Design a protein with these regions (language model features):
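Beta-rich accessory regions
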Residues: 14-20, 253-498
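Short, well-structured alpha-helical interface segments that form or flank functional binding sites
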Residues: 42, 220, 290
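Beta-rich carbohydrate-recognition and catalytic domains
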Residues: 1-167, 172-216, 229-286, 309-358, ...
Length: 498
């Protein structure tokens, strides 16, 4: 263990001990979502199954609650709801990555090791350089390849902006390793490039899989390549997008998916036109706080997605917190009816307790949870004939609360945290609901400081975070429609807390 890695590990231990010994701090934190053990986290990394456990690495800065020189933090889980802290996996401690170990992915090898592919950041004079590196590990400790970096500008047969070449996605197919990375072209547009290797150490450039066009975006980040229910798919997070309400995009950073055919002979991705928005890519989650999603396929056949539950554009962590950053609930993915569906992992249902059924008459308000911790699940559905709005309010007073509004007249969903502890630069978000069917189904997962909404059995997701000064609050529903609403509520508790 290098001195830099040892220092990071010591800091992680100190923060974790402080947090776990304080009931006040624990009450600030989510119950079943992963949150940084102290300090800062952003992108999920290396999300994979290895040696009987699910591994989640993440971009980690243990020395403050702001972004800083990147390390790789590491946790493991078996149920994707309870997270066990592991030693810090990577620190910026070699010439290839002395300015940061940026995002990447992980896979298992036939000899029983785990390969991490990550971006090493260094400098050439005053200029930042991003290259790709690898490390090998046993699920606990990781050793960087002595000949890092394994991919540099020398591997790419055209000019690009060398401070924007990152986020390797590594996978294996037909006995060969493949790596997809993103880079910024000289015209400032993002592109996804692909490389091939026999041993994951020496790589050959094969082509541009896909790239931005028609002023779609600037740089792309965090690529993922997968086949979901027989459909080839790319996932990436484009920057510098312009708001297009009808297409489902917002200003700044988005996270999108594209379907089509990945041709391994031409090394090109031929994308479909997405049914949701008539564009080559569609939004994955329409809320404020969702970025850099990453997937893994489990041994039980499920494809699981997890993402950073925060927005670069809107930092809202309270100043006195020892931690900043958490992940979405892991989501089971499927592709059906020509679109992506996502739902919380089925293991979440094991946390359900105290089921309550409630009716809210037309033009009435009801308190569903009274002065409770915000660990709950709420479900309701309304018929296609229902018009008006349904408001879900979390808070104790008119001075501090958050609002989720379902508008069945204009078919929209809206979140407002302007009355929360820290609204941030982006305090509200509005998005179109899917076209009406016989009924609109709403499922809401609340966990202390987040609301994740799943519409119509996972056809749409809408994720937002917030902070309130009180840990126990009311959950109220205002039914501003002409029909009664029948809803079902559960408290969500860990087994040991029951």
């Amino acid at each position: 263990m290098t001195e830099i890695l040892e220092k990071a590990q010591k800091r992680q231990n100190e923060l974790s001990e402080k947090i776990n010994s304080s009931k006040e701090i624990l009450a600030q934190r989510p119950l079943f979502h992963f949150a940084t053990p102290g300090g800062w986290c952003n992108d999920p990394n290396g999300f994979s199954e290895f040696n009987g456990k699910i591994h989640l690495f993440y971009q980690y800065h243990p020395y403050s609650t702001q972004w800083g020189p990147m390390h790789w933090g590491h946790v493991t889980t078996k149920d994707m709801l309870t997270w066990s802290l592991e030693p810090v996996a990577l620190a910026p401690d070699t010439n290839a990555d002395k300015n940061g170990c940026f995002s990447g992915t992980a896979i298992s090898t036939e000899d029983g090791r785990q390969i991490i592919a990550y971006t090493g950041v260094s400098k050439d004079g005053d200029k930042e350089i991003q290259n790709q590196c690898i490390a090998f590990g046993d699920g606990k400790t990781y050793e960087k390849f002595s000949q890092n970096p394994v991919l540099t500008a020398k591997n790419i047969p055209f000019e690009y902006q060398k401070d924007h070449f990152r986020d390797p996605k590594i996978w294996k197919k037909d006995g060969k390793f493949y790596m997809a990375c993103v880079l910024k072209q000289l015209d400032n547009c993002g592109a996804m490039v692909i490389f091939e290797s026999k041993d994951a150490k020496k790589w050959t450039y094969k082509g541009i899989l896909d790239s931005s066009r028609n002023d779609f975006s600037g740089m792309w980040e965090c690529p993922d390549v997968l086949n979901l229910d027989g459909k080839d798919m790319l996932i990436f997070s484009p920057q510098e997008m312009k708001k297009d309400y009808n297409a489902g995009f917002h200003d700044g950073n988005n996270s999108v998916y594209s379907t089509g055919i990945l041709d391994y002979k031409k090394f090109k991705f031929f994308s479909d036109i997405r049914a949701e928005n008539k564009c080559f890519a569609a939004q994955i989650d329409y809320g404020i706080d969702f970025y850099a999603p990453q997937t893994t396929k489990l041994s039980d056949g499920r494809t699981i997605l997890i993402a950073w539950m925060q927005a670069w554009e809107s930092y809202i962590t309270p100043e006195n917190y020892l931690w900043s950053g958490m992940m979405t609930i892991p989501r089971e993915l499927s592709f059906k009816n020509n679109r992506l569906y996502q739902n919380p992992v089925r293991e979440l249902e094991n946390l359900r307790t105290d089921e309550e059924n409630s009716e809210i008459p037309p033009e009435k308000e009801k308190t569903i949870l009274n002065q409770q911790e915000r660990h709950f699940e709420l479900e309701f559905q309304v018929s296609e004939k229902t018009s008006g709005t349904i408001k879900i309010i979390l808070g104790n007073t008119e001075d501090e609360y958050v609002l989720l509004k379902i508008d069945l007249y204009e078919q929209s969903i809206y979140f407002d945290r302007s009355k929360s502890q820290i609204p941030g630069k982006i305090s509200e978000r509005k998005a179109k609901l899917p076209p009406k069917e016989k009924e609109t189904k709403i499922r809401i997962i609340g966990d202390t400081c987040s609301l994740e909404v799943f519409v119509d059995d996972g056809k749409m997701a809408f994720t937002n975070t917030f902070f309130l000064s009180k840990t126990n609050t009311d959950l109220r529903i205002k039914n501003e429609t002409s029909q009664k609403i029948c809803c079902k509520t559960w408290k969500l508790q860990k087994q040991e807390a029951r």
